Design a protein with these regions (language model features):
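Mg2+-dependent phosphoryl-transfer enzymes with acidic/Ser/Thr/Gly-rich catalytic loops
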Residues: 2-7, 23-24, 195-261
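Short, hydrophobic/glycine-enriched beta-strand segments
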Residues: 6-11, 42-43
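Active-site phosphate-binding/coordination module
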Residues: 25-130
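Short, structured coil segments at secondary-structure junctions
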Residues: 62-65, 73, 180-182, 236-237, ...
């Protein structure tokens, strides 16, 4: 068990709260108590770090803002106190087109929903209920570019998101690993959703960088998550905690599991 907590990092969606939902009151009180004790509190999310993410404390009526944010599954880091940031490179338009061309037979055959994050690009392929729900929750438009690779790839982005069934997501992952041999990684962020981005980034590496910037021993960090993209975060921290209803593989590697989901 961890004896001294200097840093807490927590996944957002389905860990701290349901997607785009308020925090439970018990979580608010716990975060406030940790803040009073000068614990550095941060978010670890797959999302791009925007002003909305930077003001999550206000949105959740905490009375303070988070000390740091690990975004884009470790591809972005924001340290509020040091006013320091790190941002990964974007996929080029040429790379985007090559990736979609390679995966298009699978996308078309299985009606895989595709969208991206970065550069405020809202182009999508194969609109389904999951994309419609995401659009409503985050108040962003969907621009249908199904089958139009050139039209879809208007400008560079950080990552692709593919939404489909588990069998097809595994097929995509196998094809990407076999063809690109480590240039890109695929990460499950939610059952039925995988993301494709450059390799070499993870939430765990993001936590390492934050601690390096602030000269904090990783042994004094605690992390919370629920899915595959949180695995590195839980393993890197001094004490990794998985949600009770989390991914079985994530639960297996955690130091502890919550009593409640």
């Amino acid at each position: 068990m961890i004896n001294k907590i200097e840093v807490l990092a927590a996944d957002v969606d389905m860990t701290l709260s349901a997607k785009s939902s308020p925090l439970p009151e018990i979580t608010i009180q716990a975060l406030k108590e940790l803040h009073k004790r000068n614990v550095k509190i941060g978010l670890a999310t797959g999302r791009e770090i925007t002003e909305a993410e930077k003001t999550k404390g206000m949105f959740w009526t905490l009375g303070f803002e988070f000390d740091f944010i690990i975004g884009m599954n470790g591809g972005m880091i924001y340290d509020r106190n040091l006013n320091k940031t790190f941002t990964m490179d974007m996929l080029s338009v040429e790379e985007m087109k090559e990736i979609l061309t390679f995966l298009m037979p699978i996308i078309e055959e299985n009606k895989v929903s595709v969208n991206v994050e970065g550069n405020q690009l809202h182009n999508v392929m194969n609109i389904n209920n999951h994309l419609l729900d995401m659009s409503k929750r985050r108040n962003i438009p969907l621009i249908d570019k199904t089958g139009d690779i050139d039209g879809f790839c208007e400008k560079p982005v950080y990552k692709f998101l593919f939404r489909t069934d588990s069998k097809t997501t595994q097929l995509i992952r196998n094809k990407v690993e076999e063809h690109y041999k480590g240039k890109y990684q695929t990460i499950e962020t939610f059952p039925g959703t995988i993301e494709l981005m450059y390799s070499g980034f993870s939430k765990g590496r993001g936590l390492e960088m934050y601690c390096e910037w602030n000269q904090i021993n990783l042994e004094h960090t605690i992390a919370f998550g629920d899915n595959e993209n949180d695995n590195s975060l839980l393993l890197t921290s001094g004490w990794g905690v998985c949600l009770k209803d989390g991914n079985p593989n994530t639960k297996a590697l955690a130091d502890d599991i919550t009593d409640y989901d």
